[in-house]
């Protein structure tokens, strides 16, 4: 098994509390090459405050967060009282939605798990531009640019975030260090649990901006963290996507890398 000490190219990340440096592990690129995918994976180990990536340049490049933005959106909704608590039910109005799994009443956890865009668009509209902007600044979340529409700025407009910034934000959430109540951070963390194995626990969220074109591809994300014994691993993956058939790769590629590092699986 490779270790973090084996990574060879070092660059300073002065902006992050998680890591004093990030190393480049080009051996991870074989997982991207095997699927003919352009993308980046950032993996950080909490105890050593160290991060690694397959691509230093792309790790700091900003992209639309797409539905990974449901994480801060949920926290902001709770902080502002738009979401009353974790038990609140978001009623379906009976009108057709883009996905059948959205056509039902949903709790906060349910809405996050099925990535119900209409629910979070309504939350954003009720939060409003002024409060949304205030919290994104407090969270140091990406470009903090919400122009283009309060219910779509994270889906198709100006908000951007890098893989490095994603793991910084997730670490702050994990440690309850965001400018938000501990209770509300705990609610959202619980809603993000996507795998509970005997040896580890995964909190995560996917994102997908749409396929785009070959010359102007969309972006697909998987971000989160793994709790294993006394260690925590934060991760962020994004990839270019011009064909929806490639969408499962947003999870399968980082999963293979984390399996090779002995973090999940087996």
Swiss-Prot record:
It comes from the Bacteria. GO terms for cellular component: plasma membrane. GO terms for molecular function: beta-lactamase activity; penicillin binding. Its EC number is 3.5.2.6. Keywords: Antibiotic resistance, Hydrolase, Plasmid, Signal. It is an enzyme of class 3 (hydrolase). One of its GO terms (biological process) is cell wall organization. Substrate binds at residues 205-207. The modification N6-carboxylysine is found at residue 70. InterPro entries: Bact_Transpept/Beta-Lactamase (IPR050515), Beta-lactam/transpept-like (IPR012338), Beta-lactam_class-D_AS (IPR002137), PCN-bd_Tpept (IPR001460). The active site is at residue 67. Residues 1-20 form the signal peptide. Hydrolyzes carbenicillin, oxacillin and cephalosporin. Does not hydrolyze cefoxitin or carbapenems. This is Beta-lactamase OXA-11. The lineage of its organism: Bacteria, Pseudomonadati, Pseudomonadota, Gammaproteobacteria, Pseudomonadales.
